[in-house]
A protein has these predicted regions:
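Conserved beta3 strand of the Hanks-type protein kinase catalytic N-lobe
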Residues: 126-127, 273
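N-terminal accessory/targeting segments that precede structured cores
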Residues: 1-122, 145-174, 431, 448-456
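Helix-rich C-lobe and terminal helical cap/extension of kinase-like folds
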Residues: 5, 37, 221, 232-234, ...
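ATP-dependent phospho-/nucleotidyl transfer catalytic cores
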Residues: 70, 76-84, 96-97, 101, ...
């Protein structure tokens, strides 16, 4: 009964705020005579009023300039995810449920006043019985239930974002699906503990100057995470003050190198370096916290992405096109196989899909590469030369052609866009393309080893696929390889002539 009343109350709050927003939009359209519109500041205020999951959604949006206009991303970075602390009796209830004891009985000392209190949880300072200082991350009561309720409104929010023209290039429902997927993963603190332990192992093995907190497994549960206390200010605090952190160039170089090495060579990386999750010590050293979003990367995906990133960072036109086509072959193959399976009598539909893809590539790829080369030759702001924005422009190109990029590629771009946004704001003279080239040169021998690592079994050789289905996939794969060679030859020769 309590849960039902809470859910109903949450519905009324969300409904009231969203209705006010919709009415304002349509008043602007009817009486203002123009397009429906909501300013970046108004959107931030709406999300802050809604709180909870909507604040998390805004934080995701702030890191996606490929989805949202830049002025909205910058405004949403300032979202105030600050809420009153969990009431003492509720905090006691959480500990009694998780441990069967009060906080003061679990720890030698437990600071009741949290260091930070956000919509999904809060962090306390404490000391273990053994005397070690720790950070205790406690999930707020009813977070999972509230998120399940809020998720029902996100499709409506997606409609509003499309109606106001804020979301661009993609269907807002795609943004919503991505948000729900990652947020559900963040709600399990034991999963985050596994991520932190694996990242710490990678840091120690590779001797990177990055601090990852040690997890205390015996104290941690699905709703309470106990980890080593890491000193420092968040990168977000510097962002809001618009002042660079100490030793900013080295800090960002260390962060980029760590994320690249983790992705390409370890095959597991911290996929959410949001400014609120990056700690900076007084000496300028780097710490990473909140590893709720981390991901594995297949060897085959790492190889393709490595070739692609190297080509883009070095302005290698021919290799950029070639590696881009390699990356989209797998999702395109899946689309074509699905069409062939569902509509075997309509092979023309499959041919149409392939031709649509070719036409979109031909129409747009040349102008993109020419603009990149112009920015590179003429100097200009770092924003125009950012490899991260090049990646997203290519991904958007594939999206407009009806091709979903591989999840590993999208997650890579999302991760480095988070870094890119902070770098361009705090250290605008930081040369990201040069940093990438230096990384590839430094670890050239590692890339040779990666190229020599066997790929996973091709889709059409999977043991659970037999007969006609396997034959269709194999045939389509061969056809796409032919398509790639034809398109590459035709497009490169045409663009090279236009650039000369």
């Amino acid at each position: 009964m309590v849960r039902l009343l809470r859910t109903t109350g949450r519905y009324f709050i969300v409904f009231e705020v969203l209705v006010d927003w919709v009415l304002k939009i349509f008043r602007q359209k009817i009486f203002g005579g123009g397009a429906a519109f909501i300013s970046p500041q108004e959107l931030r205020e709406v999300l802050e009023d809604l709180g909870g999951s909507f604040l998390k959604f805004g934080q995701l949006a702030a890191m996606r300039p490929d989805y949202f206009p830049e002025e909205y991303c910058r405004e949403l970075l300032g979202l105030l995810d600050e809420v009153p602390p969990i009431r003492p009796e509720l905090l006691n209830g959480i500990f009694l449920k998780e441990y069967g004891r009060f906080p003061e009985e679990v720890f030698q000392k437990f600071e009741r006043t949290p260091l930070a209190s956000a919509s999904f949880g809060q962090v306390h300072e404490a000391w273990l019985k053994e005397g070690e200082r720790v950070a205790v991350k406690v999930q707020r009561p009813f977070v999972a239930e509230d998120f399940a309720s809020d998720a029902r409104f996100f499709s409506f929010l997606g409609w509003l974002l499309r109606r106001t023209g804020i979301v661009r290039t993609v269907n807002p429902s795609q943004v919503v699906r991505e948000f729900i997927h990652w947020t559900e993963r963040e709600l399990d603190y034991l999963k985050e503990a596994e991520h932190l332990e694996r990242l710490l192992e990678q840091v120690l093995r590779n001797k990177f100057p990055v601090k990852i907190p040690k997890v205390f497994e015996d104290y941690s549960t699905r709703r309470v995470l106990v980890m080593e206390f890491v000193e420092g200010r968040t990168l977000k605090s510097y962002y809001l003050e618009k002042t660079p952190p100490p030793r900013a160039h080295k800090l960002f170089k260390d962060l980029i190198d760590f994320e690249l090495y983790s992705y390409f060579f370890d095959g597991f990386f911290h996929a959410d370096p949001h400014p609120a999750n990056v700690l900076v010590s007084s000496s300028g050293s780097l710490g990473l916290i909140d590893a709720g979003i981390a991901s594995e990367v297949l060897v085959s995906d790492r190889k393709k992405m490595a070739r692609f990133v190297r080509a883009v960072s070095r302005d290698d036109l021919e290799e950029t096109i070639k590696t881009f086509l390699e990356m989209v072959r797998t999702p395109l193959l899946g689309m074509l196989a699905e069409a062939k399976r569902d509509y075997p009598q309509h092979w023309m539909r499959i041919q149409f899909t392939k031709n649509l893809f070719m036409r979109k590539i031909k129409e747009e790829l040349g102008s993109l590469v020419e603009r990149w080369h112009k920015a590179s030759r003429e100097g200009g702001p770092m924003h125009d030369k950012s490899p991260m924005h090049k990646f997203m422009e290519l991904f958007q190109l594939a999206e407009r052609a009806g091709i979903r990029m591989p999840p590993a590629g999208v997650l890579y771009a999302r991760t480095f866009l988070s870094i890119d946004v902070a770098v361009l704001e705090l250290v605008p003279d930081f040369d990201i393309p040069r940093s990438l080239v230096e990384f590839f040169d430094k670890f050239d021998s590692e890339f040779i080893k990666l190229e020599q690592t066997p790929d996973e079994i091709p889709l059409y050789l999977r043991p659970d696929l037999e007969g006609e289905e396997a034959e269709i996939l194999k045939m389509l794969d061969e056809e796409l390889k032919t398509l790639d060679r034809e398109l590459l030859t035709e497009r490169v020769s045409g663009m090279m002539e236009s650039l000369e």
